[in-house]
Amino acid sequence: AGGSITTNSIVNAFNNVIANANGNIATNGDVTAETGKAVLNSKSGSVTMQNVAGNSEVDIDAANNITANGSLTSTNANVDLNAGGSITTNSTVNANNNVIANANGDINTKGDVTATNGNAVLNSKGGSVNTQNVTAGQAVDIDAANNITANDSLTSTNANVDLNAGGSITTNGQVTAQKNVDYNAKGSITTGGIINSTTGNINLQTDAAQGDIIFGGDVTAEHGNINIDVLQNGNVTDDDNKFTALGDKGDINSGNFALHIKGAGDVDLHEIYTTNNAFIDVDNGNLTLAKINGDLVALRLHTEGKQMKVDELIAGTKIIAQSSDINIDKIQQRLDADGLLTIVPDSAQPNKPIDNLNIGEIITNKGVRFDHLWLNNGSINVSEGIFNIDKLVVNNVAHFSNKHMKTAVWGAPPQRDDSDSIYWNNIAVNNPANNLAEWQQEGIKPYKWMYLHFAEQPNIQYSNGILLYLRNYYYVYNQHYSAVDYMLYQLNENKAEEYDINYAPGIVQYFRYDLYDLDEDDNKSEPVKITVEA
Protein backbone atom coordinates (compact mmCIF):
# COMPACT_ATOMS: atom_id res chain seq x y z
CA ALA A 1 0.00 0.00 0.00
CA GLY A 2 1.13 3.53 -0.79
CA GLY A 3 -0.32 4.66 2.54
CA SER A 4 -1.15 2.82 5.75
CA ILE A 5 -2.47 -0.69 6.38
CA THR A 6 -4.94 -1.50 9.16
CA THR A 7 -6.50 -4.91 9.86
CA ASN A 8 -9.18 -5.12 12.54
CA SER A 9 -9.62 -8.87 12.54
CA ILE A 10 -7.67 -12.09 12.19
CA VAL A 11 -5.33 -12.58 9.24
CA ASN A 12 -4.54 -16.24 8.40
CA ALA A 13 -2.59 -17.65 5.46
CA PHE A 14 -1.59 -21.22 4.61
CA ASN A 15 1.71 -19.92 3.25
CA ASN A 16 2.97 -16.37 3.79
CA VAL A 17 1.52 -13.17 5.21
CA ILE A 18 3.26 -10.14 3.72
CA ALA A 19 2.29 -6.51 4.31
CA ASN A 20 4.26 -3.59 2.82
CA ALA A 21 3.25 0.02 3.37
CA ASN A 22 4.72 3.48 3.06
CA GLY A 23 2.71 4.55 6.10
CA ASN A 24 1.81 2.84 9.33
CA ILE A 25 0.81 -0.79 9.73
CA ALA A 26 -1.65 -1.74 12.47
CA THR A 27 -2.87 -5.33 12.86
CA ASN A 28 -5.58 -5.30 15.51
CA GLY A 29 -6.17 -9.04 15.19
CA ASP A 30 -3.85 -12.02 15.17
CA VAL A 31 -1.63 -12.68 12.15
CA THR A 32 -0.70 -16.30 11.30
CA ALA A 33 1.37 -17.76 8.45
CA GLU A 34 0.77 -21.50 8.90
CA THR A 35 3.58 -22.86 6.70
CA GLY A 36 5.40 -19.73 5.65
CA LYS A 37 6.62 -16.44 6.98
CA ALA A 38 4.98 -13.33 8.40
CA VAL A 39 6.44 -10.06 7.08
CA LEU A 40 5.30 -6.58 8.11
CA ASN A 41 7.27 -3.71 6.55
CA SER A 42 6.59 0.01 7.02
CA LYS A 43 8.99 2.11 4.94
CA SER A 44 8.17 5.43 6.59
CA GLY A 45 5.91 4.75 9.55
CA SER A 46 5.42 2.52 12.58
CA VAL A 47 4.15 -1.03 13.04
CA THR A 48 1.70 -1.98 15.80
CA MET A 49 0.42 -5.55 16.16
CA GLN A 50 -1.22 -8.17 18.30
CA ASN A 51 -0.10 -11.82 18.10
CA VAL A 52 2.05 -12.65 15.07
CA ALA A 53 3.06 -16.26 14.31
CA GLY A 54 4.95 -17.78 11.41
CA ASN A 55 6.09 -21.29 10.66
CA SER A 56 9.32 -19.77 9.36
CA GLU A 57 10.47 -16.17 9.76
CA VAL A 58 8.65 -13.41 11.58
CA ASP A 59 10.19 -10.28 10.07
CA ILE A 60 9.01 -6.84 11.16
CA ASP A 61 10.58 -3.59 9.94
CA ALA A 62 9.57 -0.01 10.64
CA ALA A 63 11.10 3.34 9.81
CA ASN A 64 9.78 4.55 13.15
CA ASN A 65 8.60 2.38 16.07
CA ILE A 66 7.62 -1.26 16.52
CA THR A 67 5.07 -2.14 19.20
CA ALA A 68 3.98 -5.74 19.77
CA ASN A 69 1.00 -5.96 22.10
CA GLY A 70 0.82 -9.73 21.68
CA SER A 71 3.30 -12.55 21.28
CA LEU A 72 5.74 -12.97 18.41
CA THR A 73 6.46 -16.59 17.46
CA SER A 74 8.61 -18.28 14.82
CA THR A 75 8.13 -22.03 14.98
CA ASN A 76 11.14 -23.07 12.91
CA ALA A 77 13.18 -19.95 12.14
CA ASN A 78 13.92 -16.44 13.40
CA VAL A 79 12.16 -13.40 14.81
CA ASP A 80 13.74 -10.26 13.31
CA LEU A 81 12.78 -6.77 14.48
CA ASN A 82 14.31 -3.65 12.93
CA ALA A 83 13.17 -0.15 13.89
CA GLY A 84 14.38 3.34 13.09
CA GLY A 85 12.82 4.35 16.41
CA SER A 86 12.05 2.18 19.44
CA ILE A 87 10.97 -1.44 19.89
CA THR A 88 8.46 -2.49 22.55
CA THR A 89 7.24 -6.06 23.05
CA ASN A 90 4.52 -6.40 25.67
CA SER A 91 4.35 -10.19 25.55
CA THR A 92 6.62 -13.11 24.75
CA VAL A 93 9.00 -13.37 21.82
CA ASN A 94 9.85 -16.95 20.83
CA ALA A 95 11.97 -18.30 17.99
CA ASN A 96 13.29 -21.75 17.21
CA ASN A 97 16.51 -20.14 16.05
CA ASN A 98 17.43 -16.48 16.58
CA VAL A 99 15.67 -13.49 18.09
CA ILE A 100 17.25 -10.33 16.72
CA ALA A 101 16.09 -6.81 17.59
CA ASN A 102 17.84 -3.71 16.24
CA ALA A 103 16.65 -0.19 17.05
CA ASN A 104 17.93 3.35 16.95
CA GLY A 105 15.87 4.11 20.05
CA ASP A 106 15.04 2.13 23.18
CA ILE A 107 14.27 -1.57 23.27
CA ASN A 108 11.79 -2.70 25.92
CA THR A 109 10.92 -6.39 26.12
CA LYS A 110 8.20 -6.61 28.77
CA GLY A 111 7.70 -10.31 28.20
CA ASP A 112 10.18 -13.17 28.05
CA VAL A 113 12.47 -13.55 25.03
CA THR A 114 13.50 -17.07 23.99
CA ALA A 115 15.81 -18.16 21.16
CA THR A 116 15.66 -21.91 21.61
CA ASN A 117 18.56 -23.01 19.42
CA GLY A 118 20.10 -19.71 18.38
CA ASN A 119 21.12 -16.28 19.60
CA ALA A 120 19.15 -13.61 21.42
CA VAL A 121 20.48 -10.28 20.17
CA LEU A 122 19.13 -6.93 21.37
CA ASN A 123 20.91 -3.87 20.00
CA SER A 124 19.96 -0.25 20.69
CA LYS A 125 22.19 2.10 18.72
CA GLY A 126 20.91 5.27 20.36
CA GLY A 127 18.95 4.33 23.47
CA SER A 128 18.63 1.86 26.34
CA VAL A 129 17.61 -1.79 26.60
CA ASN A 130 15.21 -3.09 29.25
CA THR A 131 14.37 -6.80 29.47
CA GLN A 132 12.64 -9.49 31.46
CA ASN A 133 13.85 -13.10 31.05
CA VAL A 134 16.11 -13.62 28.04
CA THR A 135 17.08 -17.22 27.18
CA ALA A 136 19.13 -18.50 24.26
CA GLY A 137 20.52 -21.84 23.18
CA GLN A 138 23.54 -19.92 21.97
CA ALA A 139 24.64 -16.38 22.85
CA VAL A 140 22.73 -13.68 24.70
CA ASP A 141 24.13 -10.45 23.26
CA ILE A 142 22.75 -7.12 24.47
CA ASP A 143 24.20 -3.76 23.41
CA ALA A 144 22.96 -0.28 24.27
CA ALA A 145 24.22 3.20 23.59
CA ASN A 146 22.88 4.15 27.01
CA ASN A 147 21.86 1.74 29.78
CA ILE A 148 21.04 -1.96 30.03
CA THR A 149 18.54 -3.14 32.64
CA ALA A 150 17.68 -6.84 32.92
CA ASN A 151 14.81 -7.19 35.36
CA ASP A 152 14.93 -10.98 35.30
CA SER A 153 17.34 -13.73 34.31
CA LEU A 154 19.72 -13.88 31.35
CA THR A 155 20.61 -17.41 30.26
CA SER A 156 22.86 -18.84 27.56
CA THR A 157 22.57 -22.61 27.51
CA ASN A 158 25.60 -23.35 25.32
CA ALA A 159 27.52 -20.10 24.77
CA ASN A 160 28.10 -16.61 26.21
CA VAL A 161 26.21 -13.78 27.85
CA ASP A 162 27.66 -10.51 26.54
CA LEU A 163 26.49 -7.11 27.82
CA ASN A 164 27.88 -3.83 26.45
CA ALA A 165 26.52 -0.44 27.53
CA GLY A 166 27.50 3.14 26.85
CA GLY A 167 25.98 3.85 30.27
CA SER A 168 25.27 1.57 33.23
CA ILE A 169 24.37 -2.11 33.43
CA THR A 170 21.88 -3.49 35.96
CA THR A 171 20.99 -7.19 36.16
CA ASN A 172 18.37 -7.89 38.81
CA GLY A 173 18.11 -11.62 38.18
CA GLN A 174 20.44 -14.54 37.58
CA VAL A 175 22.99 -14.40 34.79
CA THR A 176 24.18 -17.84 33.68
CA ALA A 177 26.24 -19.04 30.74
CA GLN A 178 27.85 -22.24 29.61
CA LYS A 179 30.91 -20.24 28.54
CA ASN A 180 31.78 -16.60 29.26
CA VAL A 181 29.84 -13.86 31.03
CA ASP A 182 30.96 -10.35 30.06
CA TYR A 183 29.83 -6.99 31.43
CA ASN A 184 31.30 -3.86 29.81
CA ALA A 185 29.93 -0.51 30.95
CA LYS A 186 30.81 3.14 30.53
CA GLY A 187 28.90 3.75 33.76
CA SER A 188 28.32 1.57 36.81
CA ILE A 189 27.47 -2.14 37.12
CA THR A 190 24.90 -3.46 39.59
CA THR A 191 23.97 -7.13 39.98
CA GLY A 192 21.03 -8.38 42.00
CA GLY A 193 21.33 -12.13 41.47
CA ILE A 194 23.95 -14.80 41.00
CA ILE A 195 26.38 -14.84 38.09
CA ASN A 196 27.47 -18.30 36.98
CA SER A 197 29.72 -19.64 34.23
CA THR A 198 30.08 -23.39 33.70
CA THR A 199 33.22 -23.59 31.56
CA GLY A 200 34.26 -19.99 30.86
CA ASN A 201 35.37 -16.75 32.47
CA ILE A 202 33.37 -14.04 34.19
CA ASN A 203 34.54 -10.54 33.26
CA LEU A 204 33.20 -7.24 34.56
CA GLN A 205 34.63 -3.89 33.47
CA THR A 206 33.70 -0.25 33.95
CA ASP A 207 35.29 2.71 32.21
CA ALA A 208 33.80 5.85 33.73
CA ALA A 209 34.63 8.81 35.92
CA GLN A 210 32.70 6.95 38.65
CA GLY A 211 32.18 3.36 37.55
CA ASP A 212 31.12 1.51 40.70
CA ILE A 213 30.56 -2.25 40.65
CA ILE A 214 28.00 -3.46 43.19
CA PHE A 215 27.30 -7.18 43.62
CA GLY A 216 24.01 -8.41 45.03
CA GLY A 217 24.58 -12.13 44.48
CA ASP A 218 27.26 -14.81 44.44
CA VAL A 219 29.66 -15.02 41.49
CA THR A 220 30.87 -18.49 40.44
CA ALA A 221 33.17 -19.61 37.63
CA GLU A 222 32.90 -23.40 37.83
CA HIS A 223 35.91 -23.88 35.56
CA GLY A 224 37.29 -20.47 34.70
CA ASN A 225 38.53 -17.14 36.00
CA ILE A 226 36.82 -14.10 37.53
CA ASN A 227 38.17 -10.74 36.34
CA ILE A 228 36.96 -7.37 37.67
CA ASP A 229 38.42 -4.16 36.24
CA VAL A 230 37.67 -0.53 37.06
CA LEU A 231 39.58 1.34 34.36
CA GLN A 232 39.03 4.78 35.90
CA ASN A 233 37.44 5.42 39.31
CA GLY A 234 34.90 3.40 41.22
CA ASN A 235 34.22 1.25 44.27
CA VAL A 236 33.76 -2.52 44.22
CA THR A 237 31.38 -3.75 46.92
CA ASP A 238 29.02 -6.62 47.66
CA ASP A 239 26.22 -7.65 50.01
CA ASP A 240 27.89 -10.49 51.96
CA ASN A 241 28.33 -12.57 48.82
CA LYS A 242 30.91 -15.15 47.75
CA PHE A 243 33.19 -15.17 44.71
CA THR A 244 34.31 -18.65 43.65
CA ALA A 245 36.75 -19.45 40.84
CA LEU A 246 37.40 -23.16 40.38
CA GLY A 247 39.71 -24.97 37.99
CA ASP A 248 42.66 -27.26 37.53
CA LYS A 249 45.42 -26.73 40.06
CA GLY A 250 48.20 -24.59 38.64
CA ASP A 251 46.17 -23.59 35.55
CA ILE A 252 46.38 -19.91 34.59
CA ASN A 253 43.18 -20.28 32.55
CA SER A 254 40.95 -21.42 35.39
CA GLY A 255 40.56 -21.08 39.12
CA ASN A 256 41.89 -17.52 39.41
CA PHE A 257 40.44 -14.23 40.71
CA ALA A 258 41.75 -10.80 39.71
CA LEU A 259 40.46 -7.35 40.66
CA HIS A 260 42.10 -4.09 39.60
CA ILE A 261 41.06 -0.49 40.25
CA LYS A 262 43.29 1.79 38.19
CA GLY A 263 42.03 5.04 39.72
CA ALA A 264 40.40 6.02 43.00
CA GLY A 265 38.07 3.56 44.66
CA ASP A 266 37.64 1.21 47.62
CA VAL A 267 37.13 -2.55 47.67
CA ASP A 268 34.78 -4.05 50.27
CA LEU A 269 33.99 -7.72 49.63
CA HIS A 270 32.82 -10.57 51.84
CA GLU A 271 34.43 -13.81 50.63
CA ILE A 272 36.70 -14.95 47.79
CA TYR A 273 37.73 -18.55 47.08
CA THR A 274 40.04 -19.69 44.27
CA THR A 275 41.65 -22.96 43.33
CA ASN A 276 44.76 -21.08 42.30
CA ASN A 277 45.58 -17.38 42.62
CA ALA A 278 43.71 -14.39 44.03
CA PHE A 279 44.94 -10.90 43.10
CA ILE A 280 43.56 -7.54 44.24
CA ASP A 281 45.33 -4.40 43.06
CA VAL A 282 44.06 -0.93 44.02
CA ASP A 283 45.84 2.20 42.88
CA ASN A 284 44.17 4.65 45.28
CA GLY A 285 41.78 3.17 47.79
CA ASN A 286 41.15 0.99 50.84
CA LEU A 287 40.64 -2.77 50.95
CA THR A 288 38.26 -4.56 53.31
CA LEU A 289 37.75 -8.35 53.15
CA ALA A 290 36.00 -10.76 55.47
CA LYS A 291 37.69 -13.83 53.97
CA ILE A 292 39.99 -14.66 51.05
CA ASN A 293 41.31 -18.12 50.18
CA GLY A 294 43.80 -18.89 47.41
CA ASP A 295 46.97 -20.83 46.74
CA LEU A 296 48.77 -17.53 46.13
CA VAL A 297 47.10 -14.41 47.51
CA ALA A 298 48.37 -10.97 46.45
CA LEU A 299 46.81 -7.82 47.92
CA ARG A 300 48.29 -4.50 46.80
CA LEU A 301 47.37 -0.92 47.73
CA HIS A 302 49.60 1.63 46.00
CA THR A 303 48.72 4.86 47.85
CA GLU A 304 50.19 5.84 51.22
CA GLY A 305 47.64 6.22 54.01
CA LYS A 306 45.14 3.69 52.63
CA GLN A 307 44.15 0.78 54.85
CA MET A 308 44.09 -2.96 54.27
CA LYS A 309 41.75 -4.85 56.63
CA VAL A 310 41.28 -8.62 56.31
CA ASP A 311 39.47 -10.77 58.85
CA GLU A 312 40.70 -14.14 57.56
CA LEU A 313 43.30 -14.95 54.91
CA ILE A 314 43.94 -18.54 53.82
CA ALA A 315 46.79 -19.33 51.44
CA GLY A 316 48.67 -22.37 50.24
CA THR A 317 52.14 -21.21 49.26
CA LYS A 318 52.55 -17.44 49.26
CA ILE A 319 51.03 -14.15 50.42
CA ILE A 320 51.96 -10.74 49.02
CA ALA A 321 50.64 -7.82 51.08
CA GLN A 322 51.41 -4.26 50.03
CA SER A 323 50.05 -1.29 51.96
CA SER A 324 51.23 1.36 54.40
CA ASP A 325 48.64 0.09 56.90
CA ILE A 326 48.01 -3.67 57.08
CA ASN A 327 45.65 -5.34 59.56
CA ILE A 328 44.98 -9.08 59.19
CA ASP A 329 43.19 -10.81 62.04
CA LYS A 330 44.05 -14.38 61.04
CA ILE A 331 46.26 -16.11 58.48
CA GLN A 332 45.96 -19.84 57.94
CA GLN A 333 47.73 -22.18 55.54
CA ARG A 334 45.72 -24.55 53.36
CA LEU A 335 45.70 -28.01 54.89
CA ASP A 336 46.99 -29.67 51.71
CA ALA A 337 49.91 -27.23 51.32
CA ASP A 338 53.46 -28.54 51.63
CA GLY A 339 56.37 -26.47 52.87
CA LEU A 340 56.66 -23.11 54.57
CA LEU A 341 54.14 -20.38 53.86
CA THR A 342 56.00 -17.38 52.43
CA ILE A 343 54.80 -13.85 53.21
CA VAL A 344 56.19 -10.86 51.31
CA PRO A 345 55.06 -7.57 52.91
CA ASP A 346 55.81 -4.13 51.49
CA SER A 347 54.55 -0.61 51.95
CA ALA A 348 52.47 1.16 49.32
CA GLN A 349 55.77 2.41 47.94
CA PRO A 350 58.49 -0.29 48.15
CA ASN A 351 61.15 2.31 49.00
CA LYS A 352 59.32 3.24 52.21
CA PRO A 353 58.55 1.28 55.41
CA ILE A 354 55.14 -0.06 56.32
CA ASP A 355 53.67 2.36 58.83
CA ASN A 356 51.57 -0.21 60.72
CA LEU A 357 51.45 -4.01 60.36
CA ASN A 358 49.32 -6.14 62.64
CA ILE A 359 48.69 -9.87 62.18
CA GLY A 360 46.69 -11.34 65.03
CA GLU A 361 47.36 -15.02 64.39
CA ILE A 362 49.23 -17.21 61.90
CA ILE A 363 48.55 -20.96 61.76
CA THR A 364 50.62 -23.08 59.35
CA ASN A 365 51.33 -26.73 58.65
CA LYS A 366 55.12 -26.41 59.01
CA GLY A 367 55.90 -22.74 59.41
CA VAL A 368 55.96 -19.24 57.97
CA ARG A 369 58.79 -17.26 56.41
CA PHE A 370 58.78 -13.50 55.93
CA ASP A 371 61.01 -12.74 52.97
CA HIS A 372 61.68 -9.23 54.27
CA LEU A 373 59.95 -6.88 56.69
CA TRP A 374 60.54 -3.11 56.95
CA LEU A 375 58.11 -1.31 59.23
CA ASN A 376 57.63 1.48 61.71
CA ASN A 377 55.27 -0.30 64.09
CA GLY A 378 53.79 -3.76 64.18
CA SER A 379 52.77 -6.96 65.87
CA ILE A 380 52.82 -10.55 64.54
CA ASN A 381 51.77 -13.68 66.41
CA VAL A 382 52.39 -17.21 65.11
CA SER A 383 50.34 -19.91 66.82
CA GLU A 384 51.76 -22.97 65.05
CA GLY A 385 54.91 -23.76 63.10
CA ILE A 386 58.33 -22.23 62.45
CA PHE A 387 58.50 -18.43 62.38
CA ASN A 388 61.34 -16.89 60.34
CA ILE A 389 61.99 -13.29 59.31
CA ASP A 390 64.93 -13.29 56.88
CA LYS A 391 65.48 -9.52 56.72
CA LEU A 392 64.11 -7.17 59.38
CA VAL A 393 64.24 -3.41 59.90
CA VAL A 394 62.08 -1.78 62.61
CA ASN A 395 62.09 2.00 62.82
CA ASN A 396 60.05 2.38 66.02
CA VAL A 397 58.96 -0.84 67.75
CA ALA A 398 57.46 -4.17 66.74
CA HIS A 399 56.51 -7.28 68.70
CA PHE A 400 56.81 -10.84 67.39
CA SER A 401 55.72 -13.99 69.17
CA ASN A 402 54.98 -17.67 68.92
CA LYS A 403 53.38 -19.85 71.57
CA HIS A 404 56.70 -20.14 73.44
CA MET A 405 58.43 -16.78 73.17
CA LYS A 406 57.67 -13.07 72.81
CA THR A 407 60.14 -10.64 71.27
CA ALA A 408 60.37 -6.86 70.96
CA VAL A 409 62.54 -5.18 68.32
CA TRP A 410 63.28 -1.48 68.67
CA GLY A 411 64.59 1.08 66.26
CA ALA A 412 63.68 3.94 68.58
CA PRO A 413 65.34 4.18 72.03
CA PRO A 414 64.32 0.86 73.61
CA GLN A 415 62.13 0.34 76.65
CA ARG A 416 61.67 -2.67 78.91
CA ASP A 417 58.38 -4.56 78.55
CA ASP A 418 57.14 -8.10 79.20
CA SER A 419 58.99 -9.55 76.20
CA ASP A 420 61.22 -12.60 76.68
CA SER A 421 63.84 -11.14 74.35
CA ILE A 422 64.46 -7.54 73.33
CA TYR A 423 66.57 -6.35 70.40
CA TRP A 424 67.68 -3.04 68.97
CA ASN A 425 68.47 -2.51 65.30
CA ASN A 426 70.52 0.45 64.13
CA ILE A 427 68.33 2.19 61.56
CA ALA A 428 71.09 4.69 60.79
CA VAL A 429 72.88 2.08 58.67
CA ASN A 430 71.77 -0.06 55.72
CA ASN A 431 68.53 1.73 54.87
CA PRO A 432 66.65 -0.71 52.57
CA ALA A 433 65.73 2.17 50.25
CA ASN A 434 69.39 2.52 49.33
CA ASN A 435 69.63 -1.06 48.10
CA LEU A 436 66.20 -2.35 47.17
CA ALA A 437 67.52 -5.10 44.90
CA GLU A 438 69.41 -6.82 47.71
CA TRP A 439 66.64 -6.08 50.20
CA GLN A 440 64.01 -7.76 48.03
CA GLN A 441 66.03 -10.83 47.07
CA GLU A 442 65.20 -14.05 48.89
CA GLY A 443 67.18 -15.30 51.86
CA ILE A 444 69.10 -13.67 54.70
CA LYS A 445 72.19 -12.87 52.62
CA PRO A 446 74.11 -10.56 52.26
CA TYR A 447 73.75 -10.27 56.08
CA LYS A 448 73.40 -6.48 56.01
CA TRP A 449 70.19 -6.61 57.99
CA MET A 450 68.92 -8.25 61.12
CA TYR A 451 67.29 -11.66 60.87
CA LEU A 452 65.04 -13.26 63.47
CA HIS A 453 64.21 -16.97 63.46
CA PHE A 454 62.01 -18.67 66.05
CA ALA A 455 63.06 -22.34 66.33
CA GLU A 456 60.64 -25.25 66.55
CA GLN A 457 62.06 -26.03 69.99
CA PRO A 458 60.55 -23.98 72.82
CA ASN A 459 62.26 -20.78 73.99
CA ILE A 460 64.95 -20.73 71.29
CA GLN A 461 65.75 -18.09 68.68
CA TYR A 462 68.47 -17.43 66.12
CA SER A 463 69.36 -13.82 65.37
CA ASN A 464 72.20 -11.47 64.58
CA GLY A 465 70.31 -8.51 66.06
CA ILE A 466 71.70 -6.46 68.94
CA LEU A 467 70.38 -8.40 71.93
CA LEU A 468 69.45 -6.09 74.79
CA TYR A 469 67.65 -8.46 77.13
CA LEU A 470 66.98 -12.19 77.41
CA ARG A 471 64.84 -13.77 80.10
CA ASN A 472 66.33 -16.63 82.09
CA TYR A 473 65.95 -20.05 80.47
CA TYR A 474 65.46 -18.50 77.05
CA TYR A 475 68.16 -18.76 74.40
CA VAL A 476 69.37 -16.80 71.39
CA TYR A 477 72.00 -18.30 69.12
CA ASN A 478 74.72 -17.50 68.31
CA GLN A 479 74.65 -14.92 71.10
CA HIS A 480 75.57 -15.81 74.69
CA TYR A 481 75.09 -12.53 76.49
CA SER A 482 72.71 -9.62 76.26
CA ALA A 483 73.38 -5.95 76.94
CA VAL A 484 71.68 -6.37 80.31
CA ASP A 485 74.11 -9.20 81.13
CA TYR A 486 77.04 -6.95 80.38
CA MET A 487 75.63 -4.07 82.43
CA LEU A 488 75.01 -6.34 85.40
CA TYR A 489 78.50 -7.68 85.07
CA GLN A 490 79.84 -4.16 85.32
CA LEU A 491 78.45 -4.05 88.86
CA ASN A 492 80.68 -6.94 89.88
CA GLU A 493 83.18 -6.07 92.65
CA ASN A 494 86.14 -7.03 90.44
CA LYS A 495 85.19 -4.63 87.66
CA ALA A 496 87.94 -2.23 88.74
CA GLU A 497 90.38 -4.81 87.38
CA GLU A 498 88.32 -5.48 84.25
CA TYR A 499 91.20 -4.58 81.96
CA ASP A 500 93.65 -6.87 83.73
CA ILE A 501 91.18 -9.72 83.88
CA ASN A 502 90.46 -9.60 80.18
CA TYR A 503 93.71 -8.46 78.63
CA ALA A 504 96.58 -9.35 81.01
CA PRO A 505 99.09 -11.89 79.63
CA GLY A 506 98.05 -15.42 80.29
CA ILE A 507 94.38 -14.56 80.73
CA VAL A 508 92.92 -14.64 77.26
CA GLN A 509 89.34 -15.74 77.69
CA TYR A 510 86.81 -12.95 77.83
CA PHE A 511 84.35 -13.04 80.68
CA ARG A 512 86.13 -15.28 83.20
CA TYR A 513 83.00 -16.20 85.14
CA ASP A 514 84.29 -14.25 88.20
CA LEU A 515 87.61 -16.08 88.46
CA TYR A 516 89.91 -14.12 90.80
CA ASP A 517 93.05 -12.32 89.61
CA LEU A 518 96.20 -13.40 91.49
CA ASP A 519 98.26 -10.60 93.00
CA GLU A 520 101.87 -11.04 91.87
CA ASP A 521 103.36 -9.07 94.82
CA ASP A 522 106.42 -11.15 95.91
CA ASN A 523 106.46 -9.53 99.38
CA LYS A 524 103.34 -11.44 100.47
CA SER A 525 104.19 -14.52 102.46
CA GLU A 526 100.65 -15.92 102.49
CA PRO A 527 98.67 -16.89 99.41
CA VAL A 528 95.44 -15.09 98.70
CA LYS A 529 92.53 -16.76 100.40
CA ILE A 530 89.54 -17.78 98.37
CA THR A 531 86.16 -17.53 99.98
CA VAL A 532 83.29 -19.39 98.38
CA GLU A 533 79.81 -18.56 99.57
CA ALA A 534 76.98 -20.90 98.76
Indicate residue ranges for each PLM-predicted region.
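Extracellular beta-strand scaffolds
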Residues: 3-6, 11-13, 17-18, 23-27, ...
